[in-house]
Swiss-Prot record:
This is ATP synthase subunit s, mitochondrial. LRR repeats lie at residues 62-87, 88-116, 117-141, 142-173. Residues 1-25 form a transit peptide. Homotetramer. Associates with ATP synthase. Residues 1-61 are annotated as: N-terminal domain. Mg(2+) binds at residues 59, 93. Involved in regulation of mitochondrial membrane ATP synthase. Necessary for H(+) conduction of ATP synthase. Facilitates energy-driven catalysis of ATP synthesis by blocking a proton leak through an alternative proton exit pathway. The gene is Dmac2l. It is found in: Mitochondrion; Mitochondrion inner membrane. Keywords: ATP synthesis, CF(0), Hydrogen ion transport, Ion transport, Leucine-rich repeat, Magnesium, Membrane, Metal-binding, Mitochondrion, Mitochondrion inner membrane, Repeat, Transit peptide, Transport. The keyword Metal-binding applies.
């Protein structure tokens, strides 16, 4: 007890960090915890269930193959026959997904659509990592990236590796500067791609 009191007094004597700064670090730490990959869980329940848990924990929504309804509540995840629920679409609007969690997506084979909107932790390295996932390269048909302020031309260019991509919508990305060059890159790499740019 004496030791705790001594440490407590020392901590109290330190210059206080402003609450907003302190709060920001707390939330960043918590979001990092939410994104941490549990490889044992991944092995035990399979990629679609583990990825569903991760995405919902981070505030995203998922839709399974053969279902119209979006799942957004962690407590409503299907409990039985987890093997038959395959993720077809991901809506990560306002979610805290980040690059350290992307290993959850390695085994996903049926994802056709991803929406990344107002994802503050999505950066170029996240898009580059996503574009390296072989299963996603094959399955992804539609991708929307909206209001992700840390994305630049370098991250967007990596998306050309999604060889079956049919639709790409990019909007409100202040870090993306050369839209003419991007349009040319995608026209060359993915001639059948419908590219919509709403960039300044």
């Amino acid at each position: 007890m004496m030791m705790f009191g001594k440490i407590s007094r020392q901590l109290c004597s330190l210059k206080k960090i402003p609450w907003s700064c302190d709060s920001r670090y707390f939330w960043e730490w918590l979001n990092t915890v939410f994104n941490k990959v549990d490889y044992e869980r991944l092995r035990d329940v399979g990629p679609d269930r583990a990825a569903s848990e991760w995405l919902l924990r981070c505030g995203a929504k998922v839709r399974y193959c053969g279902h119209q309804k979006w799942l957004h509540d962690y407590n409503t995840l299907p409990g039985s026959s987890i093997d038959r629920y395959k993720i077809q679409a991901i809506d990560a609007t306002d979610s805290c997904i980040m690059d350290i969690g992307l290993d959850h997506m390695v085994g996903l084979e049926h994802v056709e659509k991803i929406t990344l909107c107002k994802c503050h932790y999505i950066e170029d390295n996240c898009l580059q990592r996503l574009s390296q996932l072989e299963n996603l390269r094959k399955s992804l048909l539609e991708l929307e990236i909206i209001a992700c302020g840390n994305v630049t031309d370098n991250g967007v260019i990596a998306l050309r590796h999604f060889r079956n991509l049919k639709y790409l919508f990019l909007s409100d990305l202040p870090g993306v500067k050369d839209k003419e060059y991007l349009a040319q890159v995608f026209k060359t790499a993915l001639p059948s791609l419908e590219l919509k740019l709403n960039l300044k």
